[in-house]
Amino acid sequence: MSSSLPPLSLSILGVEPLDEFIKEIADFIHHMIVTRPDLPGNVEVEAKIGLLRDRGGGRMFLPVLVETILAPDSIDCRFESNMTAAQHKHFNTLLNKLKISSSQPGYASSSPLDYHHLHLVDAFYPSESNDREKIRVTRDEKTGTVTESMKKIRLGDLNVYSPKRMADWRVSVNLEVPVAQFARYSTSSCWIFDTYPEKDRMSYSHEEFNIDLTQVTSTNPSGTPEILHELEIEIARPALLLSTAAKRGDMNASEHERDAFDELIRAFVNNARILVRNASDGWH
C-alpha cells in the first residue's frame, strides 16, 4: 500500500462547507444596507485595524484560541484604532514594497497597486437637523478645494478579536449623506471644535478596495499637538456594493450575480486579515 496521500474530496458531499466567519460579516453588512435610513448618500464599508481594550485600558482577553466575531454590544470593551509611529512606518514600508513588487512580471496578483499621497484638512460644523450630528467638510490642504462635504450616520459595527495577532479589527458600516451648502459655513463662530484635524494620507488602491494609512494631527485644548496613526481598508465603489447587495439571493439573477456580494465581502475580509496578520509588535 502506498504511503503517499491520494487526492481527497472537499467533503463527503464533494463541496467545501460554507465559511461561517465570512458569511456572518456578509450577513451583517447586507442587513445594514437593506435597513438603512431612506436618505440619499453612499454606504461606506470599512475595516479599521486596532485594539479591543477592556475597562482598565489593557488589551481585552477572551478564552478563545482563534479569530472571533463579537456579538454587538455583548462585551464591555472599546475599539482603539490608533497605532504607534513605529507601526505606521512598518505598514508604510510594507505597502510601498508591495506596490513596487505588484508592478513586476510574475506577481501573484494580476492587479498592481496604485498610490496617491493626500494632504487634507477636516472641519466640523453643527447639523441643523440634529445637534448631535456633525457636518464634515474636507479640503485639500494645498489648494483649499473642497473634496468632500457630508454628514456621516453610523449604521453599525462588528468587532473582531484576534488572540494570535498583535492587533484586532472592526468592520463599520456608515451612511455618508452629502451636504451641498458648505459655502455658507464661512466664519469661525460656526465651528464645533477649535482644532482642525490635518490628515497626511497615503492611499493605496487594489482592485475594489482602498487601503488608507493616515497620520492625523490636531491640537488639544492645552495647545499641544496630538498625533494619531490609523490604518483602514474600504470598499472603493459604493455603487457596486449596493448593486451586488440588491441581487444577493435573487433567483431571477444569474448565479454569478447572486454570489457577487459575498465574493466582494470575502475579498474585503481577506484583505483585512492580511493587514492584521502583518501587524508587528509595538501597539499602544
Question: How should these model regions be labeled?
Answer:
Residues 1-284:
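Phosphate-end processing signature that detects enzymes handling 5′-triphosphorylated RNA
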